[in-house]
């Protein structure tokens, strides 16, 4: 009897320790502000494992600002420079960053991007291709529209259950990117099929969004002006608006589920959104609604 109870206590202790480990361990996301003094309000991100020995450096477009923000040991942990798309304000720093990492003996550093239009690209992932970064699982979700080589990176930590998605200029908080190389139909597919399906509906509420720019205040202003015009009409937007009034950084605060509740580009069948694009009868296609929303946003 003593032996059985002893074993039971040991098993209980093991389960408690395991649960505590899941609660205390975490993946790390370090946002790096770039071009904030010149109006670009870009983000680069250092995504790291729990022990910070392995990292991805996402969209390090401005090397001087990135090097200033990161410690030498953080740079030495970088296994890959990763781009969400080829625009210079996301991939323009690839060469200088790789050179610096090579000086730090990161001889095998890779450059992962959606096409060879990003300087120094060594790997081009296919849609839904997966990578491992230590214990982290990373799924590449190709989202052509803003550019045809746009890729979002969905990250999950199976130990802590933390989840994040790095969306570049495809999905912003309460908005989306311009359709420079695509159509409204492609953006609808990117946001409402590829991202949502790639993450999976059971994970939407726990997946934090890390966009390529801090455009949230501008996006909220548009949604309030053009769609949900009065407080109380959309509680999720009210909450986001209040947060924006009190904070400058929204990256990593809101989830995909939040986006589904206030982002008009992800609420194309909402009668209020239809009214905003002068389609009260709901006769327009989703692609047409997306195009009209983007046209309205571009005019602000």
PLM segments and residue spans:
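Divalent metal-coordination and catalytic microenvironments
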Residues: 47, 59, 85, 97, ...
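Pocket-forming structural segment of enzyme catalytic cores
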Residues: 135-154, 168, 178-179
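Conserved beta-strand hairpin/beta-sheet module of binuclear metal-dependent hydrolase folds
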Residues: 23-76, 153-167
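Active-site HxH/HxHxD metal-binding segment of metal-dependent hydrolases
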Residues: 55, 62-142, 156, 161-163
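Active-site metal-binding loops of divalent metal-dependent hydrolases
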Residues: 60-62, 86, 116-117, 145-147, ...
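Accessory terminal helices/loops
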Residues: 2-22, 193-208, 215-300
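Active-site-flanking alpha-helical
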Residues: 92-93, 97, 152-153, 176, ...
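Charged helix-capping and loop-helix junction motifs
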Residues: 182-191
